[in-house]
From Swiss-Prot:
Family recorded in the similarity comment: Belongs to the UPF0220 family.
Entry keywords, A to Z: Membrane, Transmembrane, Transmembrane helix
Domain of life where this protein originates: Eukaryota
Xref: InterPro entries: UPF0220 (IPR007919)
Name of this chain's protein: UPF0220 protein C8D2.02c
Amino acid sequence: MTLLDSSIFRFRLSSLHVSSRSLGVYFAGIMFASAVWVFVDAALYSAFDYARNLHITFIDWIPFLCSILGIVIVNSIDKSRLSGDSFAYTDESLARKARFILFIGFALLAGGLGGSFTVFILKYVVAGYEGKSLLMGSANIISNILFMISATALWITGNMNDDYHYNLQL
């Protein structure tokens, strides 16, 4: 059975050049930094005298922090631990635990995105804010979308098989 027959998807990511993998990691970093910048910019905008009647509070930070925690969890899991088929140091219970932790990470990412929409609707749209105040609420949504793009790009590039990749362990 070849690698293409045993994979879930029919496209081969291993045919991409090593520089494509580096570009994917850089792209994920750019998306992550942009997400942080968009939200922190909105928080600083609301902290000063520019937004007199509306400020970004801890409620606005909760979806942001959930997404960051989700990215850390998702990208901290060793991808080889997800399949119970490997023979090195894994068993079915370890694969099950890794899948559960991966699910928690993706649930935190999705919860952060859903929470940002909820905060935007309840705090900004229902209250009737408009203009730049509405942009402060949409900054949370934009940053969480950028977090999702970053996590997806890093997950895909982390799963690329590289013919010249050696894993040396003692």
